[in-house]
Amino acid sequence: MAKLHRWKVMHTQPAQIRPGKWITPNTGDQGFPDLVMVHPIRGTIFVELKATKGVVSNTQWDWINALEDAGCEVHVWRPKDLDKISARLAQ
């Protein structure tokens, strides 16, 4: 959907290193949002993606709060948010 509206997208995905053990092979503070999307007119968005019952961790909240304090637009999006996501990406 983001590509349809010409957003540049960076999606960080975890890798399974052994059964039940997942890591994201990035350096830096833990909890950085899953998506960073940039559009030359529509701005920059940081997004934490969660499953329907997924819980935002304390380290993820630390990043969300730090980014918001810095004036960034940050969202936690779930599958139920599809209409809201579509509207934001189109505006």
Q: Model segments located where?
A:
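Catalytic phosphate/metal-binding cores of nucleic-acid and nucleotide-processing enzymes, i.e., regions
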Residues: 1-91
